[in-house]
Curated annotation (Swiss-Prot):
Lineage per the UniProt record: Eukaryota, Metazoa, Chordata, Craniata, Vertebrata
Region (NLS binding site (minor)): 319-407
Annotated region (NLS binding site (major)), positions in chain: 150-242
Domain notes: Consists of an N-terminal hydrophilic region, a hydrophobic central region composed of 10 repeats, and a short hydrophilic C-terminus. The N-terminal hydrophilic region contains the importin beta binding domain (IBB domain), which is sufficient for binding importin beta and essential for nuclear protein import. The IBB domain is thought to act as an intrasteric autoregulatory sequence by interacting with the internal autoinhibitory NLS. Binding of KPNB1 probably overlaps the internal NLS and contributes to a high affinity for cytoplasmic NLS-containing cargo substrates. After dissociation of the importin/substrate complex in the nucleus the internal autohibitory NLS contributes to a low affinity for nuclear NLS-containing proteins.
Protein name per its UniProtKB record: Importin subunit alpha-6
Transmembrane spans: none
Ranges of Basic and acidic residues composition bias in the record: 26-38
Subcellular location: Cytoplasm
GO MF annotation list: nuclear import signal receptor activity; nuclear localization sequence binding
InterPro entries the record matches: ARM-like (IPR011989), ARM-type_fold (IPR016024), Arm_3 (IPR032413), Armadillo (IPR000225), Importin-a_IBB (IPR002652), Importin-a_IBB_sf (IPR036975), Importin_alpha (IPR024931)
Domain IBB: 1-60
Entries under SMART domains matching the protein: ARM
Record bears the keyword Phosphoprotein: no
Membership in a protein family: Belongs to the importin alpha family.
Length: 539
């Protein structure tokens, strides 16, 4: 079979032999919002690194302090040297450049020194934030520009209301102009500020994008030879690409792909991590967006980075690869052609549960593909490890492995399904029938149904009349569990359980008590209460 089948053939193939309970859209599962909110926390951590410069040595312990809500800081006594003084206010509004610089530095130190900088106190002083913004325009005084940019960066690292103050004072267009400053310190601080602003929420992100940040930002990334500037600029770019509710305007952010594809070959793990995060955001969408990412030529390098020795690179690279294989069979094949399966097999053995889970999710979208792609997973010796995961891993990882197995039983050829049975997939699928997660119970039922359907077909062809897989399910206590599911609160589950028993395990006609009655008013099956299977429910 041609692995590059046309979409039309693909749809026909899906409809003709795949389990009707799992349509192609369900089998290929887009990523749900899992809260990789990038990353107010990360921005706070970066600001901690910046604040370290002004921390006295005996205050190093503050680095271990938890990040608190800015409101908490109002209850903490502020040392006298950390107060906003009348002299500071007077100097910042003076016409003397030296006094302006001295006052701005004092404000910057206040906003940099503590884990809980007095942002509220600063923004409540009338005209102070506006004064910082005014100083951004002082091209003849780059030191004042830098100090003002630093102060505004730290204000924008706070809550949405703090960030909003910076936006409303008109700082964003000026920061964007400063990306082309001839002073690298000013450039770096400007891009850091813009990253903080864009990273707050979708509204702030879109405001920054609509101010036409991308051309000067990409120019900065192309021309800068300073590693810290590149790190901050890539991080800001990743924040511009981030978000799903709503996502950024793809036409505004997709021009960054050429620069990202070049930066994928950076030797710096921080740069690589944020490049991969940006690519994961851009590929998290419909197939037309996935195709644009593929066309930028990043796939082979993303797959190579799955084997990187730093998990902060591996995790976003895996996320991006996983998003790409949510596309159609042809898009999935691009990743397979980059030798992704040996890398995914390696990641199934990762000590990090989150990586194992993500690898299973990625494989589940590959096994939702065509039979040649399922065969590639078989040839890669991945299914034995998946079945072990299905038996032993944490539940969230077992769920993804269950999808991978069931997808293969839905789209696989008879010999491929028989292979899964010989590996022992029936017992762990039966074990999932007692979990509390209704969706996974349905996935397990679908997998077992696909196996039983094949057995029925084989028994008719062989003229034996006995479905060989019924006995295997009974031996795994699966029949007891399926019978119990006839009293499940979920209608689809109890209907499926009833159908499986009726079709494959038979109901004795002389035992009418086993046949569910129908409530004519509610049009629902009425089942007798079954005793729970001996093993009970699992969490």
């Amino acid at each position: 079979m041609d692995s590059m089948a046309s979409p039309g053939k693909d749809n026909y193939r899906m409809k003709s032999y795949k389990n009707k309970a799992l349509n192609p859209q369900e089998m290929r599962r887009r990523r749900e919002e899992e809260g990789i909110q990038l990353r107010k926390q990360k921005r706070e951590e970066q600001l901690f690194k910046r604040r370290n410069v002004s921390l006295p040595r005996n205050d190093d312990c503050m680095l271990e302090s938890p990040i608190q809500d800015p409101d908490v800081s109002s209850t903490v006594p502020i040392p006298e040297e950390d107060m906003i003084t009348a002299d500071m206010i007077q100097m910042i509004f003076s016409n003397n450049a030296e006094q302006q610089l001295t006052a701005t530095q004092k404000f910057r130190k206040l906003l940099s020194k503590e884990p809980n900088p007095p942002i509220d106190q600063v923004i409540q002083k009338p005209g102070v934030v506006q004064r910082f913004v005014k100083f951004l325009e002082r091209n003849e005084n780059c030191t004042l520009q830098f100090e003002a940019a630093w102060a505004l960066t730290n204000i924008a690292s706070g809550t949405f209301l703090h960030t909003k103050v910076v936006i409303e004072t008109g700082a964003v267009p000026i920061f964007i102009r400063l990306l082309t400053s001839e002073h690298e310190d000013v450039q770096e601080q400007a891009v850091w500020a813009l990253g903080n602003i864009a990273g707050d929420n979708a509204e702030c992100r879109d405001f920054v994008l609509n101010c036409e940040i991308l051309p000067p930002l990409l120019e900065l990334l192309t021309n800068s030879n300073r590693l810290t500037t590149t790190r901050n600029a890539v991080w800001a770019l990743s924040n511009l690409c981030r978000g799903k509710n709503p996502p950024p305007n793809f036409s505004k952010v997709s021009p960054c792909l050429n620069v990202l594809s070049r930066l994928l070959f950076s030797s710096d793990p921080d740069v690589l991590a944020d490049v991969c995060w940006a690519l994961s955001y851009l590929s998290d969408g419909p197939n037309d967006k996935i195709q644009v990412v593929i066309d930028s030529g990043v796939c082979r390098r993303l797959v190579e980075l799955l084997m990187h020795n730093d998990y902060k690179v591996v995790s976003p690279a895996l996320r991006a690869v996983g998003n790409i294989v949510t596309g159609d069979d042809i898009q999935t094949q691009v990743i397979l052609n980059c030798s992704a399966l040996p890398c995914l097999l390696h990641l199934l053995g990762s000590p990090k549960e989150s990586v194992r889970k993500e690898a299973c999710w990625t494989i589940s979208n590959i096994t939702a593909g065509n039979r040649m792609q399922i065969q590639a997973v078989i040839d890669g010796s991945i299914f034995p490890v998946l079945i072990e995961v299905l038996q032993k891993a944490e539940f969230r990882t077992r769920k993804e492995a269950a999808w991978a197995i069931t997808n293969a039983t839905s789209g696989g050829a008879p010999e491929q399904i028989r292979y899964l049975v010989t590996l022992g997939c029936i017992k762990p699928l039966c074990d999932l029938l007692t979990v509390m997660d209704s969706k996974i119970v349905q996935v397990a039922l679908n997998g077992l149904e696909n196996i039983l359907r094949l057995g029925e077909r084989e028994s008719k062809q062989n003229g034996v009349g006995i479905n060989p897989y019924c006995a295997l399910i009974e031996e795994a206590y699966g029949l007891d569990k399926i019978e119990f599911l006839q009293s499940h609160e979920n209608q689809e589950i109890y209907q499926k359980a009833f159908d499986l028993i009726e079709r494959y395990f038979g109901v004795e006609e002389d035992d009418p008590s086993l046949v569910p009655q129908v409530d004519e008013q509610q049009r629902q099956f009425l089942f007798q209460q079954c005793e729970a299977p001996g093993e009970g429910f699992q969490l």
